Amino acid sequence: MTDRPTFVYVTFIQATPEQVWHALTDADVTAEYWAEHCNISDWQVGSAWEHLRTDGSGIADLVGTVLEAVPPKRLVITRTGPNDERPAGPGRVTFDIEPHGDIVRLTVTHENLSDDAEYVLVSAGWPSVLANLKTFLETGRVLPQGPWEMYAEMRAARMAFNDPK
């Protein structure tokens, strides 16, 4: 048993498991809903993956390894910054895709978070990305504003409110 935080998020998407799998693993599709990033890999067990900026800089803000890939049911990856020193090892993200009639239950479990601060970050990040993914799959368009912008605005307002000046 670990004292390290774990984040779990469940969403329901009107799509097939194959469509959800494709949206999680196709670089061009991830670029549509993942805010200026795409996910690059061949998605084979043991392969590397990168969360690459789409600005042409070639910078990967997150990297990891594919631990498990069972299309279209389950994808497990490690996740860390490219230069992070994490004594307990990288985070681990599991995507479980379960069909139910005309919908899919997508469960994202992010384990081995380094601390409560990382938990707060992923608690804002995953719901934003998954809301955009859901909207994209159901409508063919992403949300009109990036949900992560709301978090940044709330954080800035909170910092201004707590500023003793």
Task: Tell me what each language-model feature is.
Residues 20-21, 30, 49, 66, ...:
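Hydrophobic pocket/interface hotspot
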Residues 8-9, 15, 19, 28-63, ...:
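Short beta-edge strand/loop motif at the mouth of beta-sheet-based domains
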Residues 58-62, 80-87:
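Vicinal oxygen chelate
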Residues 11, 62-68, 91-98:
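Hydrophobic/aromatic beta-strand elements that line small-molecule binding cavities or substrate pockets
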Residues 23-24, 69:
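Conserved catalytic core of Hanks-type protein kinase domains
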Residues 112-165:
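A conserved amphipathic terminal alpha-helix motif
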Residues 17-18, 67-73, 96-105:
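A short, structured loop/turn motif at beta-sheet edges
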Residues 82-128, 133-135:
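Beta-strand/loop substructures that line and gate deep hydrophobic ligand-binding cavities in soluble
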